[in-house]
UniProtKB/Swiss-Prot annotation:
GO terms for molecular function: acetyl-CoA carboxylase activity; ATP binding; carboxyl- or carbamoyltransferase activity; zinc ion binding. Residues 27-296 form the CoA carboxyltransferase N-terminal domain. Keywords: ATP-binding, Cytoplasm, Fatty acid biosynthesis, Fatty acid metabolism, Lipid biosynthesis, Lipid metabolism, Metal-binding, Nucleotide-binding, Transferase, Zinc, Zinc-finger. This is Acetyl-coenzyme A carboxylase carboxyl transferase subunit beta. It comes from Stutzerimonas stutzeri (strain A1501) (Pseudomonas stutzeri). It comes from the Bacteria. A zinc finger (C4-type) spans 31-53.
Amino acid sequence: MSNWLVDKLIPSIMRSETQKSSVPEGLWHKCPSCEAVLYRPELEKTLDVCPKCHHHMRIDARTRLDIFLDADGREEIAAELEPVDRLKFRDSKKYKDRLSAAQKQTGEKDALIAMSGKVLNVPVVACAFEFSFMGGSMGAIVGERFVRAANVALEKRCPLVCFSASGGARMQEALISLMQMAKTSAVLARMREEGLPFISVLTDPVYGGVSASLAMLGDVIVAEPKALIGFAGPRVIEQTVREKLPEGFQRSEFLLEHGAIDLIIPRAELRSRLARLLAQMQKLPTPVETSQVTAKA
């Protein structure tokens, strides 16, 4: 190749490499179900539900509460509580290092957020699990925040709603995490004695100690479409029983068909339908529907 051609082409190639237009990170998202490539701002308008196949994608706990609660009058409960590595637990990593990494990734102190507020002007206390924080696992702080949220509901004489998304008990806290199953179940028994409603909303996924305790103790148990719900995962069960499981086993539709849950409600309808349900359970006037907030209000 002649020198003049090299001199001409090389600078041109280098300029094109350095001058490539930069696309903001996270602008496009691939649906994990149908693999459609979706424009992130448009996806936010549908509350992270794929407009092509209606797959309900996982959303973080704060977005979940932003979608559900009225904008005014929210108050976070027990936000000051932080997990402590009392057992000095270590597997492939130190527990305190796992906590630090999860806190940095999510911006949360632990895997449950609780708030008091209103939904369509109906007073409520709401909790949401943060699955990105160590798989939404339930340790001492998750259990304590849930109990404090229930106590606020008892004090205010209002219902409790919990959006679960969890892999179960947090193994790094050993028996301390298992205690939370009894602890959360006990406070829900108090709510039942006081005649205060508890609605459990199961989102993808709900497993282990959470599904074996608070998640399945709702006066009404609701799930999002196609959420995975169970105690052990399908693969573990298949390996144990050495049989092929039925189609759709552990999906919310399968559980509804077999009477394990009461309702399946699409995400876009959760706010209005739960508000009406809460009002009916307390014999309050039917709430007036307002426009559904988006994930990024």
